């Protein structure tokens, strides 16, 4: 996918920097409220251990569920109206919803607002689509890998900042601070992102069937969507049991929260280091090779996690797993760029986001169910089997793909 001369004039490198900053701010904004979400649910009147766990799970998951539903609509609108306006819509919409969340008076209002947050989201997939349609094809892996580190960085710093802010100012003010971060993202995007987009009338838009027929390899694209979902399932399945597993490994120690936080964070740090480098390597040797190698590496790391005896052994393995994970989504996104045209980029990336959100909902449910029935260690083995299935499925799809042609 080669950019036009007008894209060169736009300066895609500057757009990449600004989009990275936007992904960082939205990633931080989303994760700022995560550390105290159950506490806020309790403040809104939910009492009792079981009810609190249930409502905390519902308000967490509903955002991803509604994001999965809304993403294709926003992707189609981005292909018609442009990606910059979708970035602005997302940042502004989420900022307003965050303000309203800070004013919620009961759990039902909060639940509706969490659903609305999912409906109005979509900054990251539209940022991916914007950069993918402007960057030279031979730099796609590096550019998308670099862009992915923005959201990861924000998600790493957000919980730390959110916890500190909640301790100093209380729970509700953090929502207003989060809204101000999103408004800053809106202003930066408005002033600094440049896009020359020719709006397409609704009549000229390709319908879903035509989108599928326009793909060089629909089967491969579908397999990439499934891969995205499984990546998130594998990541999310471990999240609900990580702290409890660390406690089981550590025994009676006083700083279990600190140890758990460190082990939870190290994959993100590793992904920050690996994503641009492996993306650049993918530009040289092919993102398909990077994808398969990273998936195999993930399986080889997940299996021993089930047999570790100390938290530090788990931490080392999770750091290495994070390095592999840093290559996965950028490799998928680069392959999507190679196998679709600029005309449908918004929808392709939004469909991919929908599968990612489905994985975000499914993963924690799977992990919780397995651990409840078979114990913590079984979660890692089952997750390894799921990723192994994905290796076989992806390998088969990549092996059958046609010779790539440049579209766009």
From Swiss-Prot:
Main localization (coarse): membrane
Keywords from the named record: Antibiotic resistance, Cell inner membrane, Cell membrane, Membrane, Transmembrane, Transmembrane helix, Transport
Entry's Gene Ontology BP terms: response to antibiotic
GO-annotated molecular function: transmembrane transporter activity
Entries under InterPro entries matching the protein: MFS, MFS_dom, MFS_MdtG_subfamily, MFS_sugar_transport-like, MFS_trans_sf, Mutidrug-R_MdtG, Tet-R_TetA/multi-R_MdtG-like
Transmembrane stretches, start-end: 16-36, 58-78, 92-112, 115-135, 146-166, 173-193, 224-244, 253-273, 290-310, 319-339, 378-398
Organism domain of life: Bacteria
GO cellular component, one term: plasma membrane
Bilayer topology term: Multi-pass membrane protein
Entry-linked SUPFAM superfamilies: MFS general substrate transporter (SSF103473)
Entry-linked Pfam families: MFS_1 (PF07690), Sugar_tr (PF00083)
CDD domains: MFS_MdtG_MDR_like
Location in or out of the cell: Cell inner membrane
Family: Belongs to the major facilitator superfamily. DHA1 family. MdtG (TC 2.A.1.2.20) subfamily.
Database matches in NCBIfam families: PRK09874.1
PANTHER family: MULTIDRUG RESISTANCE PROTEIN MDTG (PTHR43414:SF6)
Role according to the record: Confers resistance to fosfomycin and deoxycholate.
Identification of the protein by name: Multidrug resistance protein MdtG
Lineage: Bacteria, Pseudomonadati, Pseudomonadota, Gammaproteobacteria, Enterobacterales
């Amino acid at each position: 996918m080669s950019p036009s001369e007008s894209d060169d004039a736009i300066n895609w490198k500057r757009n990449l920097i600004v989009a990275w900053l936007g992904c960082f701010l939205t990633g931080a904004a989303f994760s700022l409220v995560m550390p105290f979400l159950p506490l806020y649910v309790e403040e809104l009147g939910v009492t009792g251990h079981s009810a609190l766990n249930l409502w905390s799970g519902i308000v967490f998951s509903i955002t991803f569920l509604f994001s999965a539903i809304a993403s294709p609509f926003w992707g189609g609108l981005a292909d018609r109206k442009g990606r910059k306006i979708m970035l602005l819509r997302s940042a502004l919409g989420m900022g307003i919803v965050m303000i309203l969340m800070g004013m919620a008076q009961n759990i039902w209002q909060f639940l509706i607002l969490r659903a609305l947050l999912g409906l109005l989201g979509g900054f990251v997939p539209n940022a991916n689509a914007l950069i993918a349609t402007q960057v030279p094809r031979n730099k796609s892996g590096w550019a998308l890998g670099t862009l992915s580190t923005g959201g990861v960085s924000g998600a790493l710093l957000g919980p730390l900042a959110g916890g500190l802010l909640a301790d100093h100012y209380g729970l509700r003010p953090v929502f207003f601070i989060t809204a101000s971060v999103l408004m800053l993202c809106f202003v930066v995007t408005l002033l600094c992102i440049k896009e020359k987009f020719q709006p397409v009338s609704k009549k000229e838009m390709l319908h879903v069937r035509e989108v599928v027929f326009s793909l060089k390899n629909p089967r491969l694209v579908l397999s990439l969507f499934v891969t995205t979902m499984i990546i998130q399932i594998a990541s999310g399945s471990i999240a609900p049991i990580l702290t409890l597993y660390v406690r089981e490994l550590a025994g009676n120690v006083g700083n279990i929260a600190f140890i758990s936080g460190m082990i939870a964070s190290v994959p993100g740090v590793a992904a920050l280091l690996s994503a641009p480098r492996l993306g650049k390597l993918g530009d040289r040797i092919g993102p398909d090779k990077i994808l398969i190698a990273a998936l195999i590496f993930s399986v080889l790391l997940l299996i021993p996690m089930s047999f570790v005896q100390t938290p530090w052994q788990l931490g080392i393995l999770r750091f290495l797993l994070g390095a592999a994970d840093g290559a996965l989504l950028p490799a998928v996104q680069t392959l999507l760029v190679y196998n679709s045209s600029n005309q449908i980029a918004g929808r392709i990336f939004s469909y991919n986001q929908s599968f990612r959100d489905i994985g975000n909902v499914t993963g924690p449910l799977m992990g919780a169910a397995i651990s409840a029935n078979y114990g913590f260690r079984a979660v890692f083995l089952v997750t390894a089997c799921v990723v192994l299935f994905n290796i076989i499925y992806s390998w088969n799809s990549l092996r059958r793909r046609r010779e790539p042609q440049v579209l766009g």
